[in-house]
Curated annotation (Swiss-Prot):
Domain of life (superkingdom): Eukaryota
UniProt-annotated location(s): Endoplasmic reticulum membrane
Family: Belongs to the glycosyltransferase group 1 family.
Presence of the UniProt keyword Electron transport in the record: no
Positions of glycan attachment: N94
This protein's encoding gene: ALG2
The protein's annotated pathway: Protein modification; protein glycosylation
InterPro entries documented for this protein: ALG2, Glyco_trans_1, Glyco_trans_4-like_N
The protein's name: Alpha-1,3/1,6-mannosyltransferase ALG2
Principal location: endoplasmic reticulum
Species name: Eremothecium gossypii (strain ATCC 10895 / CBS 109.51 / FGSC 9923 / NRRL Y-1056)
Keyword Transferase attributed: yes
Keyword field: Endoplasmic reticulum, Glycoprotein, Glycosyltransferase, Membrane, Transferase, Transmembrane, Transmembrane helix
Purpose: Mannosylates Man(2)GlcNAc(2)-dolichol diphosphate and Man(1)GlcNAc(2)-dolichol diphosphate to form Man(3)GlcNAc(2)-dolichol diphosphate.
Length: 514
């Protein structure tokens, strides 16, 4: 085993999505190998995070949450960058940046050159879930122009990493198509699922018994309430299938839900409207309301008789219970970068119906005539009619072949997607990083110079007081032993009066011509 390292993971918002699940699993896996691990994040709500965070199994430090996530519902990427820069600035100020041997950064790469510059010897591994610029909406010319510098920044700053890894071969192919000026060959580190079964909380057993009758069979969808997840596909396929009209079946739709996120609220309403237009009996339960005072919670009248049940932000314990007993997981996103939920289902022997593109091509073994010993589900085109047929095919197949998926699923997941397998992949890539010399990429210098210029120009809003911002910046750089940059800022402090006169003279000269 390698010498224990002090490892920092930097992640923007430690919620309950797939990216956050990977961060938590990576942290636990590395910690179990004897490394000291700290997760730095700009936001972590203890009521909206994974159980390992709630229990305090991992050290989590929140920095920069005082900054807004958006400005009037816009400028999300700008605010995300500012929050991450505030986080790194705090690490520089308090000296924590020099305590870490390795930084694992994901989602947002803006801080990578800064980590290289201000850390005495730390290496940086960037985990690319998917190019951020492909996730951004560009509905107008203004939004397209607004994204241009951030797209370039993503590419340049990611290129400053010591190593880049991606979550699937699908993402790897997209990486090559997107980042054309980078000469990187990222390796694949698959996300994982914990093979150990989570203990099911008593309150969740009680919750389950309240919504599922003893003779009910249910189909399950688990995703965030976002339009790109195409949860409507599961809903429309279920109501078009024969199974959907059976008296003992229902559809459970669970989703990560945050009332602060407008799309979560809007999309849940859209799904409810689909049910109402089709005269499908449905009910919505916000799990957080139940979990606050479970002994006093009153379930909606006739909840067991509802055909569709929407559950918002359920606990990991309830999720485990639902996955274990589901008839079939309906995994609806198209071109999903990886998709962890199918693995969580297959771990319990629950078959999966997923779209035949993106990550599921690597995680779900579709049933064919010659692979009954390895099949874990079905891959089908994202069409409600085709999915309805697959749902009915599954029902017939499981009746004739009970136990097939209960054997195949867990074995497939354990062999390729366990936490041990993922940790081993991470350690292999970390070994490779430390086998080579630490190199500051030219991109890093360019980014730092650009940032210095922006800071210099921005500080002018403070008038003559900006001189002392220069002096403060220079002092911080001296403390961090970055003497050349410190000299630059001290010179600005000394020469500020002359620079101001020069700028005023040039402005006065050009003004009549303009």
């Amino acid at each position: 085993m390698m010498t224990p390292l002090n490892i920092a993971l930097i992640h923007p918002d430690l919620g309950i999505g797939g990216a956050e699940r990977l961060v938590v699993d990576a942290a636990i896996g590395l910690q179990d190998q004897g490394h000291r691990v700290t997760i730095y994040t700009s936001h972590c709500d203890k009521n909206h995070c994974f159980e390992e965070i709630k229990r305090g199994d991992l050290k989590v430090v929140v920095v920069g949450d005082f900054l807004p996530t958006n400005i009037l519902g816009k400028f999300f990427i700008l605010c995300a960058n500012l929050r991450q820069l505030a986080l790194v600035f705090k690490l520089v100020i308090n000296g924590s940046i020099d305590k870490h041997d390795l930084f694992i950064v994901d989602q947002l790469s803006t801080c990578v050159p800064l980590l290289h510059l201000f850390s005495a010897s730390g290496r940086v591994l960037f985990y690319c879930h998917f190019p951020d610029q492909l996730l951004a909406q560009r509905k107008s010319l203004v939004s397209k122009l607004y994204r241009v510098p951030f797209d370039l920044l993503e590419q340049l700053t990611m290129g400053c990493s010591d190593s880049v890894v991606v979550n699937s071969y699908f993402t790897r192919s997209v990486f090559f198509d997107t980042f054309k000026i980078l000469r990187l060959n990222p390796r694949v580190v698959y996300p994982c699922v914990a093979m150990d079964e989570l203990p099911i909380e008593k309150i969740d057993i009680g919750f389950y018994d309240q919504i599922i009758g003893p003779n009910n069979r249910y189909y399950l969808s688990i995703n965030r309430f976002e339009r790109k997840k195409d949860i409507a596909l599961a809903l429309n396929a279920f109501k078009a299938s024969k199974e959907g009209h059976s008296s003992d079946t229902k559809l459970i739709i669970c989703g990560g839900y945050d009332s602060r996120v407008a799309e979560n609220v809007e999309y849940l309403s859209e799904l409810q409207l689909i049910c109402e237009k089709a005269n499908i009996a449905h009910v919505t339960i916000f799990y957080s309301e139940f979990s606050r005072t479970p002994e006093h919670y009153t379930f909606p009248t006739g909840v067991r008789e509802k055909k569709v049940i929407f559950l918002a932000s359920i606990s990991s314990s309830l999720k485990e219970l639902l996955l274990k007993k589901a008839q079939l997981l309906l995994y609806t996103p198209s071109r999903e970068h990886f998709g962890i939920v199918p693995l969580e289902a297959m771990k319990h022997g629950t078959p999966v119906l997923a779209v035949d593109n993106g990550g599921p091509l690597e995680t779900v073994v579709t049933l064919k005539s010659d692979n009954q010993d390895t099949a874990t589900g079905w891959l089908r085109r994202a069409d409600a009619g085709i999915w309805a047929e697959a749902i009915d095919e599954q029902a017939e197949y499981v009746k004739k072949n009970p136990g097939i998926f209960a054997t195949n699923g867990p074995k497939w997941v354990k062999d390729k997607f366990s936490r041990d397998a993922m940790t081993s992949s991470f350690l292999h890539n970390i070994d490779n990083i430390f086998m080579t010399d630490r190199v500051i990429q030219p991109w890093a210098v360019m980014v730092i110079l650009a940032a210095s210029y922006i800071l210099w120009r921005s500080s002018h809003v403070f008038g003559d007081a900006c001189r002392y911002i220069y002096l403060l910046t220079g002092g911080i750089l001296v403390l961090r032993s970055r003497y050349l940059l410190a000299i630059f800022w001290v010179l600005l402090f000394v020469m500020q009066p002359q620079l101001s006169v020069g700028v005023d003279t040039i402005t006065a000269t050009l003004k009549p011509k303009l």
